[in-house]
Amino acid sequence: MEMRRAGKSGLSLSRLGLGTMTWGRDTDTHEAADQCRAFIEAGGNFIDTSATYGDGDSERVIGGLIGTLFKREDVAIATKAGVTFPAGVRTVNNSRQTLIAELDKSLARLETDYVDIWQIHSWDPHN
């Protein structure tokens, strides 16, 4: 698979990324592992997730695959923060305190101490 550099960061990403929005929700752990295995065997290394996907379950599935299906250093993981659903209501909060707290939770679910790309999931006109 063709690889691309992410700006001047030195990070090398597969041109195609593996989206995981349904993992832990519509896609069970075994099917997710099969998808991930096929993606990696095809030369992919860029896995995209979010704290909101499956209420964190997508990140948990990826965390469970690290060390069993792939080595952490062999993939680039992107996740997102800033959107939560307290009491079932979509809330956007990009304050520093909220973002850092969400990053800590994502790292715990992903069972890693870093992510390669961390994104704001939605514009917050207040922060």
Name what the model sees in each region.
Residues M1-A76:
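N-terminal binding-site loop/beta-alpha segment at the start of enzyme catalytic domains
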Residues M1-E2, F46, V83, A87-R90:
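Generic preference for well-ordered secondary structure
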Residues S12, K80-F85, Y114:
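Short, basic/glycine-rich phosphate-binding loops at helix/coil junctions
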Residues M21-W23, S50-T52, K80-T84, I120-W123:
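Active-site beta-loop-alpha junctions enriched in small/polar residues
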Residues E59, K80, E102:
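Acidic-residue sensor for enzyme active/binding pockets
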Residues D74-K80, I117-W118:
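Non-cysteine beta-strand/loop elements that form the S-adenosyl-L-methionine
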Residues P86-N127:
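Glycine/proline-rich, positively charged
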